[in-house]
């Protein structure tokens, strides 16, 4: 009788067998765009006050100088650089999102992939791209069938799923065989987790997605030495991954079906606004409304009602005092207010000064977010859909429907928008525009880079 292979076995065989030549050109192109966006987010994140605290504390724990910290002239241990750079990507609500998995893949894996490759020194651009493809793809596959289930269970999606993607990359770098990779995954699964509640007010929200990928480095290094892990880490009915994180609800075919032919990472979208992704269709709809109705001023608006999913309504932070930038980025009323009053919801709209702006605080009172049964029952790819009702003081009501946020695979960035966002963010850490152009050129041609360290130097304060 032929034994059915576990998810772990199938993923491990895929990880070991994948070659750069096997990856379709459009997948590589999309991955490069996602990573460029991640690098921009990370460079900007390095300038934030919470990352300064995190960097200081982690660097005090070690004297090792194995990998660079982006946007600085500092080096630290590979695990320290992984956690710091990964957290920097997530530090201002600007990073990528996989729609179905509800994970921010870059913050979960790119810090790890880059730091480990830099530590090894001899990794080529093609080897880096192969490992990065595995990191993003495996993370998305693990998350794709259970995004809503993990969130409803109260866990952080990215911190729960991305340790497996990071493990795929580190195992690839180390040349582990399928058996060793299987055990590396089974070890790293013990680092999966993070609480959903962390995202609403605390600075800790920034660090949870990346810290769990420490398990990837530990797991792969241990497995290389013969250490064993949970072989059926995904399916085990007594505390396996899907038992714990999604109440054993998952689609095995979505996780490991058609490996190497169907690419889940193509479902990764980018953010155009500096807020929780679930607010982006609202922002897009309101911006479109103001553009189409230039005669209507913020003062003319009596009320805005946003119809959305129950989970988005639950976490809209309505009727709450906004005490932190983190909370503002999660607050639907705040996001609506700055969009109407200032025309955008980018980095300039989320400052300590803005949190105390009386115009913004007053306008927030006009916003109500309600759960909508129709939207609740839409297919998962349409879960960002919103219906917006805008009532003006003269009695008119406007109805807006927005389905795909800017940056979603169905509503992608133009090349100009991608580069604009990168330069806006990275430029806060690296003021030399010619170096920003060099980063873009090198990143978009990573397959030609002989040693990945030639690229990572560009991400530091001093550059190459």
Language-model segments: residues:
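Hydrophobic face of alpha-helices
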Residues: 28, 32, 36, 109, ...
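Short helix-coil transition sites and intra-membrane helix breaks within transmembrane domains
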Residues: 101-106, 155-160, 275
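Function-dense linear segments that define catalytic or interfacial modules
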Residues: 80-126, 134-138, 142
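Short connector loops/turns at beta-strand edges and beta->alpha or beta->beta junctions
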Residues: 89, 108-110, 115-117, 138, ...
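Terminal-appendage/accessory-domain detector
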Residues: 1-103, 200, 204-214, 221-464
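Short amphipathic alpha-helical face segments that pack within enzyme cores
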Residues: 107-115, 161, 165-169, 280-285, ...
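Glycine-rich, mobile lid/loop segments that gate access to catalytic sites or pores
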Residues: 117-218, 225, 230-241
